Amino acid sequence: YDGEVKTWLGKGIDLAHERRLAEAVPALQSLFAKAAAEYEQLKEERQELDYDDLEAGALALLQENAAVRARWQEEFQALLVDEFQDTNGRQRDMVTLLNAGRGRLFIVGDAKQSIYRFRGADVVVFRQEREQIEQDGGAGFSLETSYRAHRELVAGLNALLRPVLGEEADPERPWAEPFAPLRHHREEPLPGFAEPHMELHLSVGTKSGGALERAGDALAGRIVELVSGGPLDYGDFAILCRASTSFSAYEDALERAGVPYLTVAGRGFYGRSEIRDLLNILQALADPTDDLVLAGALRSPAFALSDAGLYHLARTRAEAEIGIWDVLRHGLAGGSLSDRDRRCAHRAAEIIARLHNQVGRTPVADVLKAFLDATDYRAALIQAGQARGARNVSKLLADAHTSGIVGVGEFLEYVIGLRDSGTREGEARATTEGAVQIMTVHAAKGLEFPVVIIGDVTRSGGGGGGLLIDPDLGPLVPVRDEQRQYPAIYRLGKAREDDQEAAESDRLLYVAATRAREKLILSGCISVKKDGSISKSGGWLGTLAGEEVLDLEGHPLSCDPEGAGAHQIDLLAGSTPAACTIYEPGYAWDQRPREEETEPEIVTTLPPPLLAP
């Protein structure tokens, strides 16, 4: 970074501003110390430990207690640590103490697949441990043969990923792992998988202008076409995205095309309307005197009270100065309701009263299943053409059973924890036959699919100008001076942080692409210049479209930003053909009607009490 530092110095530095920031750091550290002390006190009062405590406590025990350390050193004849590329320094220290220099350590890992930096993983730890083992007389073995992809796809992946990761190690960038070419084990693709084994389907325009939604429609059409041509099944496809916020464009497109799909984990599950309704209904069953949640339950498809009916309940509530639950269970608004709303209200009052008595006495899964049976909620969703919603309801019921929780409040806290914590990625993975799977790249780690689609390829990774904690430079505060410049030390730390994030983004692309067995497809949107030629792209596509890889940007093309055509471009990833189709905004994919429109139900094994009629 010497060149960058000289550039910054050349622009001049506001020394007074730098001094003020330096003086603010101790105050920031003091504030952090107070917050940390309160957090520690709260954990002590609750007798709870977080994951950081478990790691720190285990390491301290091994470091400070010789008897405990010797006990566990004798316990293990050998140590095998898998996925070592996703460990951190503290975990490495624990392994070192347990090994005690006896040469009994065996680690397995691939630094090119280290993608959990946001959880504290440090790919540098893997490199350091690998070098230490070899210095101590151990041996390193590289497993370069891919038993997943066939010869031509492996050749294409090598050509695609080599320029992305680079081939030379840089001692100044120990967090960047260079590319190592894969070797194929399998010669031919499976029958029915003809060339091209790499495809790009890109829609012209911006995301704000709906280009990603159009890209989703084009992809859905291509999936239908591939399945119609046989012998592929919808279950052979997986759409992998950098982040779950890209899911909706593909979910909606598949739904419009009548293609069955399953969204695996992600943030979207608990945001689905049918799941929000059921969680709200569980709250109403636990406490029907809560007017807000009860009103939401009554308006849900389970009870389907009309807006007019809800208005009359609320009006009676205000006039009588009582709660909606009292109005409902005593039928006080009966004279104001239509015949239909009167029946809905009576049915809702009977079901809520009956199930309210079960809350806290039986597991929440039993309460939820009793509600679903009493209201035929899943059947109603299927009848309304929402088979996906019915599958989501089945998944929620399975989650409720798996949790083993009795109290509704405790279960809702459990759900909120899953929704809001990082553990939502890859949780509750369900197996389904005959449905396209949509998941994040992190959730796909360790999996493989016949056809992998990398979705929203122009999406960039995270980033921003927040507070940084640099291991060498300390806390770095992003406060601009009067010339809108960040402090020089912050810019130095930010440059290093951005470089580490970029290196992990490259590894994330490597993981996504190498999940494919037969075919790799890239999907997303692309911008064009005023003359109709291709603009420089962002995200992974920006990396892959350059001259060193696919050279997409170098191909002559004349797109009409308001047209309805599709442009075919024959690209090469090395010697592997890559067919690229660019769709103008008005293009409409001709989706042939499918013979079967029903979507498969996810069958989850539940214990007898939940299956009883």
Model-derived regions: residue spans:
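Anion-coordinating catalytic cores for phosphoryl-, nucleotidyl-, and glycosidic chemistry
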Residues: 281, 480, 496-513, 517
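P-loop NTPase Walker
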Residues: 37, 42, 46-52, 57, ...
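Active-site-adjacent bridging/hinge elements
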Residues: 5-10, 29-33, 99, 104-105, ...
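Short, solvent-exposed helix-loop connector elements
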Residues: 379-385, 491-505
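Conserved motor-region signature of P-loop NTPase helicases/translocases
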Residues: 7-8, 74, 81, 85-303, ...
